[in-house]
Amino acid sequence: MISNFDCTDNQASSKVLRPPGGGSSDIFGSEMPQTPRNVKNRMASNIFAAEKDNGVKNNVRQGAHRFYFIGDAPRRGQKTVDSHSRLFGEPTRPITPGKNHMKSSIPFGQNTEAVAAQKLLTTNGHYNGKSGSVSSASSSVSSSTENLKMNSGSRSGEKRLALTGAGK
């Protein structure tokens, strides 16, 4: 081993040490076995080469689904079982029929009283908004006509004259 430190000589040493990693960087003085560097040539094409074992590598996929290995199928659709379902089983739900949206509400060739009774059953007797069969204008006319019939007893002669125009 070569030593640059000499206590008896007070001259400055003119030797330059080798940079780290160059030549022999062994500080203990023994020779290191030379092994070739294992660098993958990323520019080499392997289109026609035989596939290597992908199962040998332990590649964990990064990102949202990182808890399975690349090449494995992702674990989707696993049913989570809560304690209520585990203890008591699945709840039984009554089957409700879906509404037929294509069914027409216009009666063609049917008895109008039967249709009115059917509508009364389906609406539970409530008429809100446009679902009622009688419009507000026609109901006000019919109610005023009924009021005339009921109140015609006291002044029937005056009304008849006013209606016929004979009083003038």
Curated annotation (Swiss-Prot):
Gene Ontology biological process terms from the UniProt entry: positive regulation of microtubule polymerization
Task performed by this protein: Binds to all microtubule populations.
CC terms in the record's Gene Ontology section: cytosol; microtubule; microtubule associated complex; nucleus; spindle
InterPro entries per UniProt: JUPITER (IPR033335)
Gene name of this polypeptide: Jupiter
Source organism: Drosophila simulans (Fruit fly)
PANTHER family: GEO05313P1, MICROTUBULE-ASSOCIATED PROTEIN JUPITER
Biased composition (Polar residues): 1-14, 145-155
Keywords of this entry: Cytoplasm, Cytoskeleton, Microtubule, Nucleus, Phosphoprotein
Family: Belongs to the MAP Jupiter family.
Family matches, as Pfam families: JUPITER (PF17054)
Biased composition annotated in UniProt, kind: Low complexity: 131-144
Location of the protein in the cell: Nucleus; Cytoplasm; Cytoplasm, Cytoskeleton; Cytoplasm, Cytoskeleton, Spindle
Superkingdom, taxonomy of origin: Eukaryota
Phosphoserine: residues carrying this PTM: 24, 105, 133, 144
Spans annotated as Disordered: 1-33, 76-106, 124-168
Any one Gene Ontology molecular-function term assigned to this protein's record: structural constituent of cytoskeleton
Phosphothreonine: residues bearing it: 35, 92, 96
Protein name according to UniProt: Microtubule-associated protein Jupiter
Listed Basic and acidic residues bias regions: 76-87
